[in-house]
């Protein structure tokens, strides 16, 4: 049956529709209040669809649907199918299968606390999800310090009295129920306290512990009272770090979102008893072109579908398309009413704004990390081309002059693929007469690496602090703006100094554009579309820019200095003449009329300049 024929058979009932590609793979799952209307919209208005939807439809070869009695049932089925199949074109909680949880096996005789990535219907209590495994392990460590419950999988009833205390008992992270160091009743009490702590019920827990401490003291169990006192202090120290963020004592999850072109970051603050008990951020993919409300709705469905706990109130900052339906679904899962609130003023509005700012920061950090990784991958690609493992520090050199005048050299530094401008260096060429780029390059390289040798000796003697050195850090790779002649000039200097560093010339084509790299072993052809090529071009451009800027500065100073020798020419007129003519040669060729046209110049000053260069 064709898609067109199937469209005619769609019922006017709620349900779920399932899009499939030519291999029969599920690529999209959606729900509808009226299946007939929703599914037809896709195929009858293709040109009006978002680009992402157009791409998805180009792969659809078939669809199926499942009728439900209510829209709520459709929502529940949609959540289950998305979780099961993770369709390519659905908005998905990125890598949600990997989010870790803390598991407390309250279904066991002697419960354990452990790390897990799976929620199972086994009667255990689950806390999370957390955004990182490190956060879970650190939290478990903290809980065990205050409530020393076991992590092992021993059969306590069977092993009782047959085993010795493990290391965790001796360092205070386990109460050793396996050796009867603690009776079952007291052990279960510890577990209950740990669960309250993880639930965010810390004020209630402290009150309960204070009552237990008082009772222990009254019964002259002073050692027990002291242990409980230490527990209370530990819990209070963790509670001090929590910010009071809410009015009242309700349980709230506060949700907001920040987005870039290709990904959306959802930040969730978990408020328990009016205090911030934790926060996590998650990423949603396939969100291009979607409204914020759609994305947050998708997050809520996927996040709470398998969540071990649902709060009384969810606060967010955007109207959700399915707000009432989501509230009904969440209420059914929780067992009593769940409110979805979109505040416009007051304390709750301040809270959700704060969550948005945190989402924005998390997204910025993620983008920054991705850029760092991307840069490192480009450096790795370039390093492999020149036979290195990883060229962390690349130095590039260029020479700039005008027919041998105002001769300068530049050194630019790239660390991990990024320019490090604080380590750029300038060189006035002191010992080369006329225009000789090879000799100029030799001078620059020799001075740079002699400085390095001197500074290293001073550092070894303790006469120079390492962070005060300007040249001591050596490059992993050297680039020069030029061909094989420049490369050989540099290699000769390095060889004479006993230094071995790979050197490559950045050669240009006939149109003065970067072409590739050259060394004594020959030229390396690098695809112009590669990221390594773009990095080389960036380094070459930066070395050239830095050299020519320094050259122009030096030229300008010399130019102005010579003009200042002329009667009637001061700083302002010298600058104006430099801006107008750019070189002494042009001024020498200029007529009095040409000179008079320059801003600030008059007949007398123009005549003085004209005569000065014709003495």
From Swiss-Prot:
HAMAP family: UvrC. Belongs to the UvrC family. Interacts with UvrB in an incision complex. It is found in: Cytoplasm. PROSITE patterns: GIY_YIG, UVR, UVRC. This is UvrABC system protein C. The keyword DNA repair applies. Keywords: Cytoplasm, DNA damage, DNA excision, DNA repair, Excision nuclease, SOS response. Its main location: cytoplasm. Residues 12-91 form the GIY-YIG domain. One of its GO terms (molecular function) is excinuclease ABC activity. GO terms for biological process: nucleotide-excision repair; SOS response. It holds the Pfam family UVR. It comes from the Bacteria. The UvrABC repair system catalyzes the recognition and processing of DNA lesions. UvrC both incises the 5' and 3' sides of the lesion. The N-terminal half is responsible for the 3' incision and the C-terminal half is responsible for the 5' incision. InterPro entries: GIY-YIG_endonuc, GIY-YIG_endonuc_sf, GIY-YIG_UvrC_Cho, Hlx-hairpin-Hlx_DNA-bd_motif, RuvA_2-like, UVR_dom, UVR_dom_sf, UvrABC_protein_C. GO terms for cellular component: cytoplasm; excinuclease repair complex. Residues 203-238 form the UVR domain.
